[in-house]
Each structure stands twice: as structure tokens, then as C-alpha cells.
């Protein structure tokens, strides 16, 4: 291993000088520097630029407090490597793959893999478009997820993003035996802590690996932590042959950290002050998230939209990679409809007859048409009342309200709070239920029978209890 000395420290940027004739470290190599405390604490640096004259510019993955000029820096000869495999399940890691959950020590002999890899080649990719059944009616019917696809999750505070994420993790684990990897990128430490304890309480932590690089950490850690989570997910896909769910919260913070690093490295800023390499960095991350012939990594990415401006380069670059969007709407929360997924604003590339089948596509299209018409009639109803509607419109409104309530369902992970057992509804049951509502088979049942239930049989059972 070649070694150099710190030449200068500018915040999270550290320049390291190597002696003439020494082998310079490659770009993305991890360097290690020990502070002046008898080598008890070390800092990992990642090589970003070669400046010439034996000097490399690096980005620190931890705070550079305590570093001084002249300290020795060792080249590890490889990129940052993180633990992979079944031992990672139920544990919480940082960007470097160190455990931060204060649990039992992690096995020192666990397999590790570098976070920088090439995307799968064309001949390794799976060409089939297969739906990932979630058991959540509104998603499976109107905005289905593709195996190996990328989903954008939009929603403000308190609309149920975390509960939806937990239910997806639960359903993938219970029904598909699948693994989930949760990656917290540049978000609040408190939220990560709350999520960890909630997942412990709901019992889904055993099928989940968690990786955090929160907003108090240097930009280098926030930029690379998404790759750490992805590397753990890729191992389960490529070696274990699993279908993996990868949650990234929040993909905007990945771009934001890249922008900070770019400015620190002295690159000329691009549009709105973002890094000129924005599309490349996003592409390198997103292209690794895909289906191969061995398994799949399906990612659900929470996306913060700055000032609700969807033309901002950060969200706009992420949108180019998405297959589906799931929009959570506060108005639905106020109506007591959970999950509060907006059926008209959410969309999916998978909702086509070639992928989901003719019947599913026709039912989904008709559900959207009925809900859209109901949305248009709401102003008339609010001003003039239901009496001003024609008989056909009254029937449509009644069915639309039943559809709206039937799109809600109780979640397994929320059972401890609601006291109501959760339900997993297969896609075929979902399509059949909505088809029967559209055909008018359940027009005589009360609206309340459709709220917070699973299949159409649950509606009939609830109506019977209500005396219908």
C-alpha cells in the first residue's frame, strides 16, 4: 500500500500529496487517515480528482475535525467496501458498512463488496415485463409496480409514506419471501430512529437491512450512502436470486449532496447551481437498479420537489428514470381514506393490456373514468346539491363513492394502532371486486361497508353485520 501526507484540509475536501515515483491511488479508491490519537480513530477519504504533481483531491466520508497537515494517509487499493449477505438483515449501517445500531458486534469475517460497480450488461438483463404484486388494491389496480422497476413516491408530511413503505416491506416478506433494503439519504436522524423502532415493533426488521447517511453528515457520505444500500440489494439479487425492494428516502438529497461535492471540487455549476455531472451521476445509480435473469431490484424512491417546481433539474432528472408514480394526497387523509394514494394522479408504465391483460386494463380505465367524472361533478353537488343531477349521474356518483372507499384497506403493520386486522388482496381479487362495483352488482350495499376492507367478500360480510 502506498502512503502519502495531507497537504491541505478545506472542510470535507482533503488534498493528499504522494512522493515522486509512488503509485497514485485510482479514482474512487478509499484512503485511510488516522487522527493524532494513537491510531484509535480513523477517517475514510475517497479519491475524486488527480491534480498532478503527485497530489490527489479526496472527499471525506466523516467529519475532518482533528486532521492536520502532514498526517500519513494510506491507500487501501480498492473502493469503499461494505458487508453483504444474510448477516446484514435486521441491522443498521452507515455509508462505510459499520453497524450503528449498538447491537451485537458484526462478524469480522462477513463478505464485503465494493460500492462502485458497473450496471448489468445487456445480456444479463431480463426482458420480461412482470408485475410485482403488492397486495395493496389501489397500487395493484391503477399504478402497478414492475419487477425491477423504479417507483417515485410523492407526498408531504403526515400523509402515510412511512406506513405505506412498512406495508410494502411486510407484504414482500410475507407473500414473496423477499428482502428489503431501506436507505436513508440526507434525511432527519429522528425519522430514521422512529422508523427503526416502528419496524422492530411491527416485526418487519428481520427481513430488512437499513443504511443511513443523514443530513448532519458530510456531503461525501450523503452522496455515497445510496450506493451502499444498492450494493447490499444487488448481492441479494445476483447471488441469492431474490426479488429485492430498495427504498431510497430521499433521492433529491442524493442530488443535493452531489451538488455540494461538485462545488467543493471546483467544478463549474450548471443550471440552477446543480453539478454539471447531474445526469451522469443519476444514471450510474439508476441503471444498476434493474431486473436480471437471476432476480430483481425494485426501487421505491421518495422524491422531494423543491418549491413544488417539477421542472427543477433535480426531480426532472429523476423522473426520466421512473416507471411508476405513487402520489399521496392530503385531501384523502382528511376523508379518512388510507392508504391516501391519489388514484388519478398516480400512474404506471405497466398499466397496458400487454402487461396486465385486457380485463385488468379495461377495469382500471373505467375506474379512472368514473372517478374523474365524479371529481368534475363535485362542484355542481356542492353548489346545487344531488337533486340537480340526472339519474345516470346519481348512479355514477354512488358507484364512484363506493369505489373511492373500496380503494382503502387496513394495513397489517397498522393493526397495533387501529385494532383492525390488515388484508393482502391478490390482483385477480382486486380486479373482480372493482368490476362487480362498476357493473352495479353492489349498488344496494351501504357505502360504509366498502371502507377499510380487503376483497369484495369482506364487503358482503361487513354489510351483513350491518344488517343488509
Swiss-Prot record:
Q: Which reaction does it catalyse?
A: ATP + H2O + 4 H(+)(in) = ADP + phosphate + 5 H(+)(out)
Q: What subunit structure does UniProt give?
A: F-type ATPases have 2 components, CF(1) - the catalytic core - and CF(0) - the membrane proton channel. CF(1) has five subunits: alpha(3), beta(3), gamma(1), delta(1), epsilon(1). CF(0) has three main subunits: a(1), b(2) and c(9-12). The alpha and beta chains form an alternating ring which encloses part of the gamma chain. CF(1) is attached to CF(0) by a central stalk formed by the gamma and epsilon chains, while a peripheral stalk is formed by the delta and b chains.
Listed EC numbers? 7.1.2.2
SS bond partners = none
Question: What's the superkingdom here?
Answer: Bacteria
Alphabetized, the UniProt keywords read: ATP synthesis, ATP-binding, Cell membrane, CF(1), Hydrogen ion transport, Ion transport, Membrane, Nucleotide-binding, Translocase, Transport
**PROSITE patterns for this protein:** ATPASE_ALPHA_BETA
Keyword Protease recorded: no
Membrane topology per the entry is: Peripheral membrane protein
The cross-references to Gene3D superfamilies, in alphabetical order and at most eight, read: 2.40.10.170, Bovine Mitochondrial F1-atpase, Atp Synthase Beta Chain, Chain D, domain 3, P-loop containing nucleotide triphosphate hydrolases
**Family stated for the protein in its record:** Belongs to the ATPase alpha/beta chains family.
Protein's name according to its UniProt entry: ATP synthase subunit beta
**Protein purpose:** Produces ATP from ADP in the presence of a proton gradient across the membrane. The catalytic sites are hosted primarily by the beta subunits.
Where along the chain is ATP bound? Answer: 155-162
Supply one GO molecular-function term.
proton-transporting ATP synthase activity, rotational mechanism
Name a single GO cellular component: plasma membrane
What Pfam families does its record include?
A: ATP-synt_ab, ATP-synt_ab_N, ATP-synt_VA_C
* Principal subcellular localisation of the protein: membrane
Localization, per the record, is: Cell membrane
Amino acid at each position: 500500500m502506498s502512503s502519502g501526507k495531507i497537504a491541505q484540509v478545506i472542510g470535507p475536501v482533503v488534498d493528499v500529496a504522494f512522493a515522486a515515483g509512488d503509485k497514485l491511488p485510482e479514482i474512487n479508491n478509499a484512503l485511510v487517515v488516522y487522527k493524532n490519537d494513537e491510531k484509535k480513530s480513523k477517517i475514510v477519504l475517497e479519491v475524486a480528482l488527480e491534480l498532478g504533481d503527485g497530489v490527489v483531491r479526496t472527499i471525506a466520508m466523516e467529519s475532518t475535525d482533528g486532521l492536520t497537515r502532514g498526517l500519513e494517509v494510506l491507500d487501501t487499493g480498492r473502493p469503499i467496501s461494505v458487508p453483504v449477505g444474510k448477516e446484514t438483515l435486521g441491522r443498521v449501517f452507515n455509508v462505510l458498512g459499520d453497524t450503528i445500531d449498538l447491537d451485537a458486534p458484526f462478524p469480522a469475517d462477513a463478505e464485503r463488496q465494493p460500492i462502485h460497480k458497473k450496471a448489468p450488461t445487456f445480456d444479463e438483463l431480463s426482458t420480461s415485463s412482470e408485475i410485482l404484486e403488492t397486495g395493496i388494491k389501489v397500487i395493484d389496480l391503477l399504478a402497478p409496480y414492475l419487477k425491477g422497476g423504479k417507483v417515485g413516491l410523492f407526498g408531504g408530511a403526515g400523509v402515510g409514506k412511512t406506513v405505506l413503505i412498512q406495508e410494502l416491506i411486510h407484504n414482500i416478506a410475507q407473500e414473496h419471501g423477499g428482502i428489503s433494503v431501506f436507505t436513508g439519504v440526507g434525511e432527519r436522524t429522528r425519522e430514521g430512529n422512529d422508523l427503526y423502532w416502528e419496524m422492530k415493533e411491527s416485526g418487519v426488521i428481520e427481513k430488512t437491512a437499513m443504511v443511513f447517511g443523514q443530513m448532519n453528515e458530510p456531503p461525501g457520505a450523503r452522496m455515497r450512502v445510496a450506493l451502499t444500500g444498492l450494493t447490499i440489494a444487488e448481492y441479494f439479487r445476483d447471488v441469492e436470486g431474490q426479488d429485492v425492494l430498495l427504498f431510497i428516502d430521499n433521492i433529491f438529497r442524493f442530488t443535493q449532496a452531489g451538488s455540494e461535492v461538485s462545488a467543493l471540487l471546483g467544478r463549474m455549476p450548471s443550471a440552477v447551481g446543480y453539478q454539471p455531472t447531474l445526469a451522469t451521476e443519476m444514471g450510474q445509480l439508476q441503471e444498476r437498479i434493474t431486473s436480471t435473469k437471476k432476480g430483481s431490484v425494485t426501487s421505491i424512491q421518495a422524491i422531494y420537489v423543491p418549491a413544488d417546481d417539477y421542472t427543477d433539474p433535480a426531480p426532472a432528472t429523476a423522473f426520466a428514470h421512473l416507471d411508476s408514480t405513487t402520489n399521496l394526497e392530503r385531501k384523502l387523509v382528511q376523508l379518512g381514506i388510507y392508504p391516501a394514494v391519489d388514484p388519478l394522479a398516480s400512474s404506471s408504465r405497466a398499466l397496458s393490456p400487454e402487461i396486465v391483460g385486457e380485463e385488468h386494463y379495461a377495469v382500471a380505465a373505467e375506474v379512472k373514468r368514473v372517478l374523474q367524472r365524479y371529481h368534475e361533478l363535485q362542484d355542481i353537488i356542492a353548489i346545487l346539491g344531488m337533486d340537480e343531477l340526472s339519474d345516470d349521474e346519481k348512479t355514477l356518483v354512488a358507484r364512484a363513492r363506493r369505489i373511492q372507499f373500496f380503494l382503502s384497506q387496513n394495513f397489517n403493520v397498522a393493526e397495533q394502532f387501529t385494532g383492525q386486522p390488515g388484508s393482502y388482496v391478490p390482483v385477480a381479487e382486486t380486479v373482480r371486486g372493482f368490476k362487480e362495483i362498476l357493473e352495479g352488482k353492489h349498488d344496494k350495499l351501504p357505502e360504509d361497508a366498502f371502507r377499510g376492507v380487503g376483497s369484495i367478500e369482506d364487503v358482503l360480510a361487513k354489510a351483513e353485520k350491518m344488517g343488509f
